Amino acid sequence: MKGIFGVLLTILLCPFHAMAQANSTVFRFSDGGTATVREIVVGDPAAVDTLVFTYGGSGCTDLARYWLPTLADGMDIPARFMALNKRHVVSGQAQGGGSDACSREFRAWNLPRHWMADYMEFVSRTLAAEPGRWKNVVLVGGSEGGALAARVARARSDITHLIVVGDGGWSMRDNLSSLMGADVVEAAWKDIARHPDSAEALWRGHPYRYWFDTFDHAPLVDYLALGIPVIIGFGERDSSVPAASAHEVLRAARAAGKQNIGLVVYPGADHSLQAEGHDHLREFLRGAGQGIASGRLD
């Protein structure tokens, strides 16, 4: 792809601004359930032609607290940025990567089949409200949300770009086996498989039913099915997802003759692309945003 490699270079050269504030609305799903939507518009609301969607990663943090403002300020392009919180996320809530501190209602709903259905409905109805308006429709996913973004992008024909932070092509089983050892993971899996519907029994901060539904999906198949531009940002010292899983996406794409996927690995950086006081996350987002706005990722 003509623009991927130029954008990877541009990603390293970026100044920053203060974070924008998100507006809030409530989205009502076809089944009657609701979730909060956070929105930031950069530029003239009537003129912007880029729409950026993002969805929750692991846990129940309100995306307006950090992720959406960071995304909008980091990409720094005229666009409408929309974040769909998972159902049962409390406004203003801040919480770490697990779901053990989340409500029982959240844990009961926090399953991949629900994420996929909710995100698809939200994207479809948002696009249908203004048909033909958007030149660029971008999905951005971080961590667990990266795998979902890749799956949603694969399921649709109206997404133009995919940006992923901190997620690669391996399944959770393979990620955790690499980080913790296969014996530890297999022992945990045996107990999970005995109680696959439990929302009370927890492992690593998540209910067994969450693990049972997520353990063996490998996002690699979704990445390889995509023809749109994809950029993945990764920390070399990510302790949540091995960097090797991101390298596997690039290796498999090249082996398949695909040139639409780019990877940036930041030396010494963690799962959030932070390294010894350096905020590589914003660098990464800025380069991706400039590539989209300039057309070099088309």
Report each predicted region and the residues it spans.
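Conserved alpha/beta-hydrolase
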Residues: 75-101
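Short alpha-helix in the alpha/beta-hydrolase fold that links the catalytic acid
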Residues: 66-68, 228, 242-253
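Catalytic active-site module of serine/aspartate enzymes centered on a nucleophile-bearing elbow/loop
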Residues: 267-298
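Short, surface-exposed "cap/lid" segments of acyl-processing enzymes
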Residues: 45-76, 83
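Hydrolase active-site cap/lid region
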Residues: 155-202
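Alpha/beta-hydrolase active-site loop
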Residues: 102-129
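Short beta-strand/loop motif that positions the catalytic acidic residue
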Residues: 226, 232-234, 238
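N-terminal cap/lid segment of alpha/beta-hydrolase-fold proteins
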Residues: 21-46
